[in-house]
């Protein structure tokens, strides 16, 4: 059994576009305690099961892609029955698919007694997806390149957070397609955020954080911008994670408007989640 933790972006900056079409980024990634769960059993063939009917269970799923990469690398023909209990919303900018793929790599390495090192798993992870290497370790990490160059940062305390997501998904590819690098008027102050992380004073991050994909997502889905502005007016410093549409904020339990906020969002059909920062990407239990 493996818990695969979701992630948020404390800052997301796009530096430029490479010749191969990928974007150069600087991202501060942070695990949160919202998680999927994978259960793996020995089996004669490779299969994936989930009750979430929106998810493919073939090669389009990163779990199967990860399993085939590890098979191809090692030459093993072992099978596995993988059951996915899905809690992280799909297409939400929370890295659920990447977390599941990382869990599959670690779980199959153990199930099939392959004894691959973490560095080998990280190389396989890059070939599965840009966020998968981060999900292997999790915690608080600075990612550069296309997201594969990772620097592990000091762990942040388990501060309470609040997430909310509209009743639709967002295509990351579509957001990047609509991103105009020349129109970005404010970049997150990564250097200052790194200094704050070193001190652990997470609440002072609000002056420096940012996500340059917000403008592109807001153009496609103006209701996300409207809710973000409404939350800001209510006194909640709020940001979008990834390509959206999920919004997140740090919160103190003493905020009197919080119940009203949750009620209104649910009235609008938005999903909500109260959780905390997490220091790991995965949790493996026998």
Label the predicted regions.
Residues 12, 36-40, 131-135, 141-142, ...:
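Short beta-strand scaffold segments in enzyme catalytic cores
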Residues 30-31, 126-127, 133-136, 153-157, ...:
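Solvent-exposed alpha-helices and their adjacent loops that cap or buttress functional pockets
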Residues 44-56, 104, 199-210:
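Short, basic/glycine-rich phosphate-binding loops at helix/coil junctions
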Residues 83-112, 130, 237-251:
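Glycine/serine-rich anion-binding loops at beta->alpha junctions
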């Amino acid at each position: 059994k493996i818990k695969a933790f979701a992630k948020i972006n404390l800052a997301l900056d796009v530096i430029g576009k490479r010749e191969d079409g990928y974007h150069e980024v600087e991202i501060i990634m942070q695990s949160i305690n919202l998680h999927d769960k994978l259960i793996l059993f020995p089996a004669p063939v490779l299969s994936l099961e989930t009750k979430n009917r929106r998810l493919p269970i073939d090669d389009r799923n990163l779990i199967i892609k990860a399993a085939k990469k590890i098979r191809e690398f090692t030459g093993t023909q072992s099978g596995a029955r993988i059951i996915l209990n899905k809690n992280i919303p799909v297409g939400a900018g929370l890295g659920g698919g990447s977390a599941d793929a990382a869990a599959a790599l670690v779980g199959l390495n153990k199930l099939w007694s392959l004894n691959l090192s973490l560095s080998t798993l990280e190389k396989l992870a890059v070939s599965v997806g840009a966020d998968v290497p981060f999900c292997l370790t999790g915690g608080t990490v600075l990612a550069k390149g296309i997201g594969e160059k990772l620097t592990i940062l000091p762990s942040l305390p388990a501060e309470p957070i609040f997430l909310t997501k509209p009743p639709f998904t967002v295509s990351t590819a579509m957001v990047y397609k609509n991103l105009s690098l020349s129109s970005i008027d404010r970049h997150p102050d990564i250097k200052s955020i790194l200094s704050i992380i070193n001190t652990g004073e997470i609440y002072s991050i609000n002056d420096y954080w940012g996500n340059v994909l917000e403008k592109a997502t807001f153009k496609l889905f103006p209701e996300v911008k409207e809710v973000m502005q409404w939350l800001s007016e209510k006194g909640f410093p709020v940001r979008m994670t990834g390509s959206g549409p999920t919004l997140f904020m740090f919160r103190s339990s003493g905020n009197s408007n919080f119940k009203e906020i949750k009620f209104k969002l649910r009235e609008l059909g938005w999903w909500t989640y109260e959780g905390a920062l997490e220091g790991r990407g995965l949790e493996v239990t026998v």
